[in-house]
Amino acid sequence: MKLSFTKMQGCANDYIYLDCRASGVPENIAALSEKLSRRHFSIGADGIICICAPRTAGADAMMRIFNADGSEGKMCGNGIRCVAEWLYTHGIAKETLAIDTLSGLKTVTHQGAGLWQVEMGAYSAMPADLPAVNMGEDALVNKVLTVDGKVWQVTCISVGNPHCVTVVEDVDSLKLEQIGPGFEHHANFPERINTEFVQVVDATHLKMRVWERGSGETWACGTGTCATVAAVTELGICPAGEDIHVQLRGGVLTIRVLPGKQLLMTGAAETVCEGTTEV
């Protein structure tokens, strides 16, 4: 059977996008995501994002995210910008789009020429919202976490999916393929966790790398960038209410923390190619 797809990327966080609005999500989507995401052997991507018919009144579409290991994610910040760009170029040319996710309805606004701003909603540092266990009941800001025998200072943030953020001196020197799995599968995070390693350049500029649950190190993570800015704001490193520019391996995202812990994310979305593949 031939399957039509669009490959898109936001800050090099690349996914295979499927139009499932009429057909629904394929029954074998987990296996399909594993197969098609394999770099060098297939299309290659961080996973598959299905663009589905909306399930919520007022939504233009719904997105479902499947990681490279077949597991389903709740939200993808880079992915939602690409969904907006796909809809915009495939017949829903609205300047403001409402996209449903497993983390709720998100508003995405066109900023011109492939640039989109996403209202990501409010973040939380409370253990129950991640979830996290054995870390106390108060906000998970500047906590101690021992990973594979090494002690880290971490701040844990939920932005609809869970993140563990740690500030480091030199992010480029880290061997994430050795460090990341210990965070992802730590017993304190029963649903696994995404981990961000951030280097502070100055009060409005950060440099970050990410280890995503289910995908390993990726070149960017929109929700992870939001969680990182939320964390350093909680720590008093960066100011709320100002644009914070985060350099990722794949590009730059701009995040702002608004009153009520609301987050705004601005970044690009680009179509890489379109095609069909045998499945």
Locate predicted features:
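A glycine-rich beta-to-alpha transition motif near the start of alpha/beta enzyme domains, typified by
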Residues: 1-113, 165-279
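Intrinsically disordered, low-complexity regions enriched in acidic/Ser/Thr/Pro/Gln residues
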Residues: 116-118
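Active-site glycine-rich loop that binds ribose-phosphate moieties when present
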Residues: 124-153
